[in-house]
Amino acid sequence: MFWKGPVFTKTGFKGQGVSLESCEIIETLDGEEDGVIVPLFRNCHTHLGDSLARKELPKKLSLTELVGPSGWKHKWLAENDLKSSIIHGLKEVISSGTGLVMDFREGGEAGLQLFDDLEYPGTVILLGRPEGNKLLPRENAGISSIIDVENSKEIARLARERNGLVGIHHSEGCRENIEPLIDLCPDFVVHMCHASDNDFEKIKDAGISVVVCPRSNAYFGNRAPLEKMISLGLDIGFGTDNGMLCSANMIDEIRFIRKEFGDLSLHTILSIACFGLDDMFNKDRTSTYSNLEQSGWILLSRAEENEYESVFNPKSEVLGVRWRN
């Protein structure tokens, strides 16, 4: 079995299809085209637990009022069925052909356990939060911010002892001091909307990756300097952030990015969506993310003659997903 159509790779579209058995790219195929083929997307930052809050979201709340430590979001989380909310978010993830989700999980070990028996054919990386006396429930740490979390250094140390990842929000609503972040040296930082050029230079020198969430940022009137990050050669990923603000659909995200960041090439946007945080993942040479043939594929309907324009055209739909081996 195979899909016939142009296949997106790091160097552009190539080949004439993919094998659905081995996931390998096929150079020559007979027959009519099935569509345009791209690797599974990577959603590098989500909060799926508040997905169902989208229907109840109050208007005109500030960033702090909505997602701060005492904000509306946390009151909603305490009063609602989070498992149903996560399932709703995962349906959006699956429908858009997303093979990797990196979810910041509130609620300590109990929050992580909400994922334990859920059916998702892709890979979930859960980044836990402190709860009670337990600083780090499992191996990965998702720190809200250095300002909000007093024990961030100890949390990061525990994560590294367990070979886990450390992620943290920074400079989302205003510029924050970069020095404590560099001292913490997380694997990746989320947002950086108000970071200075010097901040980005220090991030690059420290080998820290960056995840950008353009739709979520735009909700609060923020805009990450994505063009600057790309020009510096930073390791970048895209995320959809809070489910209460935006769908967890990566196709929606990249089509928004195209409109908001019109100077970026479609190849660059699609590359980040499909191969985001590659440098971070490939620090571990055993990572399957370094092997394109193990990444899985999405078949999109052909909406335009140009392959890139077709992917970004709202009329193009997901026809099928070949999940990772």
Spell out what each predicted region is.
Residues 1-31, 283:
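N-terminal metal-binding scaffold of metallo-dependent hydrolase/deaminase domains
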Residues 6, 19, 23, 34, ...:
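Divalent metal-coordination and catalytic microenvironments
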Residues 39-51, 165-172:
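Histidine-centered catalytic micro-motifs
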Residues 50-84, 174-185, 209, 257-264:
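Active-site gating loops and adjacent loop-to-helix segments of metal-dependent hydrolytic enzymes
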Residues 74-140, 144-157:
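Active-site loop-helix segments enriched in His/Asp/Glu that coordinate
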Residues 84-86, 266-277, 289-293:
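Short, well-structured alpha-helical segments that form the helix of a local strand-helix-strand
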Residues 130-244, 262-263:
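Active-site core of metal-dependent hydrolases
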Residues 288-325:
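C-terminal cap of metal-dependent C-N hydrolases
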